[in-house]
Swiss-Prot record:
This is Zinc metalloprotease Rip1. Keywords: Cell membrane, Hydrolase, Membrane, Metal-binding, Metalloprotease, Protease, Transmembrane, Transmembrane helix, Zinc. It is an enzyme of class 3 (hydrolase). One of its GO terms (molecular function) is metal ion binding. Its EC number is 3.4.24.-. It is a multi-pass membrane protein. InterPro entries: PDZ, PDZ_6, PDZ_sf, Pept_M50_Zn, Peptidase_M50. The active site is at residue 22. It comes from Mycobacterium bovis (strain BCG / Pasteur 1173P2). GO terms for biological process: proteolysis. PROSITE patterns: PDZ. Pfam families: PDZ_6, Peptidase_M50. Changing residue 21 to A: Does not restore cording to deletion mutants.
Length: 404
């Protein structure tokens, strides 16, 4: 029951985020003298609407977004006589840019508010964990009897028996230098027998011989990344974990901006990698293992939201919503039509072009002909809609689950 409740709550939170995005456009458009014809939440048939002043407000049947209809957003629109002087495309560049940025800006504001609240209540995670092979804990070596499921074991493991402690930094496994925990684990998996391992402890290099223990682990087979059971070496160590840091009312402010900046970099990397994830999504639809690093749709996001609520992980619920708003802001600022960033790029281009013409003693040129940009816009739309359908299908037939 809580899982379904979580799905509904997260879907509602997404809808509110989109509604606030459009509200940002509407509020700034009004403040700068433009006419807002309609403000609707959802698409499709109208369920309810009312008119206040010159704006019609309403709710439509399909709760998958919303829109804010500003008069004269492009020169190709039909305008009523009272709209001609207030048409958006005729306004000063700074006004147009302000209106267009207000939507993504609202999503960014939501992200900042949520991250600030998380910093106060739960603390912020460290996006830059230790890059060295720092040992966090030692223990026995358990067999992975099935994917993600370890059998019970007791007693010290090979690392502990050899004298390796929590806080030690592994720098070499046999003849292989390692600079991260993943590199260390990979080197151990390939080893067997008694292997010299070099660790740094309090600035001193210590060589200790560790008896590598054979065990079963599920690892990628190298052909499409499918996980398969394999016999590998293990020494019974875990990576050092850096817990979240809680902040006060004032210290949380710079921490929020710093964390959001780091998160934006990660979001940018993820967006740049989208084309490389198509194959993994297709394999997931065909019944293969779903890569948790593949992108998700609104459907997948709501399922993850349901998982977080079902297990009482409200911090994950709000953090995921903050991250989603940051993604919405970032995508909408891409300088491609039909995104807000594409319209901003057109407005800035017109401004620079007319400044150059003015410097040459020429009059301002006509606004950009959006009809000539339609082919490029349609290409972007086809790619975006196609990718959305791919992710929705993958989320329906093979969703990413936090707990299974």
């Amino acid at each position: 029951m809580m899982f379904v409740t979580g799905i509904v709550l997260f879907a509602l939170a997404i809808l509110i985020s989109v509604a606030l995005h459009e509200c940002g456009h509407m509020w700034v458009a009004r403040r700068t003298g433009m006419k807002v014809r309609r403000y609707f939440v959802g698409f499709g048939p109208t369920l309810w609407s009312t008119r206040r002043g010159e704006t019609e407000y309403g709710v439509k049947a399909v709760p998958l977004g919303g829109f804010c209809d500003i008069a004269g957003m492009t020169p190709v629109e039909e305008l009523d006589p009272d709209e001609r002087d207030r048409a958006m495309y005729k306004q000063a560049t700074w006004k147009r840019v302000a209106v267009l940025f207000a939507g993504p800006g609202m999503n960014l504001a939501i992200c900042l508010v949520l991250i600030y609240a998380i910093a106060l209540v739960w603390g912020l995670p460290n996006l830059h964990p230790p890059t060295r092979a720092v040992i966090g804990e030692t223990g026995c070596v358990a067999q992975e009897v099935s994917q993600g499921k370890l059998e019970q074991c007791t007693g010290p493991g090979p690392a502990a028996l050899a004298g390796i402690r929590s806080g030690d930094v592994v720098v070499k496994v046999g003849d292989t230098p390692v600079s991260s925990f993943d590199e260390m684990a990979a080197a151990v998996r390939k080893s067997h027998g008694s292997v010299p391992i070099v660790v740094e402890r309090d600035g001193t290099a210590i060589v200790t011989y560790v008896d590598i223990e054979s065990t079963q682990r599920w690892i990628p087979n190298g052909q499409g990344g499918e996980l398969q059971p394999a016999t590998v070496g293990a020494i019974g160590v875990g990576a050092a974990r850096v817990g979240p840091v809680r902040y006060g009312v004032f210290s949380a402010m710079p921490a929020t901006f710093a964390f959001t900046g780091d998160l934006t970099v990660e979001v940018g990397k993820a967006l740049a990698a989208l084309p490389t994830k198509v194959g993994a999504l297709v394999r997931a639809i065909g019944g293969g293992q779903r890569d948790p690093q593949t992108p998700i749709s609104v459907v997948g996001a709501s399922i993850i939201g349901g998982d977080t609520v079902d297990h009482g992980l409200w911090v994950a619920f709000w953090f995921f919503l903050a991250q989603l708003n940051l993604i919405l802001a970032t995508i909408n600022l891409l300088p491609l039509l039909p995104f807000d960033g594409g319209h901003i790029a057109v407005a800035v281009f017109e401004r620079i072009r007319n400044m150059v013409r003015s410097a040459r003693g020429k009059v301002a040129a006509a606004p950009v002909n959006y009809l000539k940009l339609l082919p490029a816009t349609y290409v972007v739309l086809v790619l975006v809609v196609g990718y959305m359908l791919l992710t929705v299908t993958a989320d329906l037939v093979n969703p990413i689950r936090l707990f299974q």
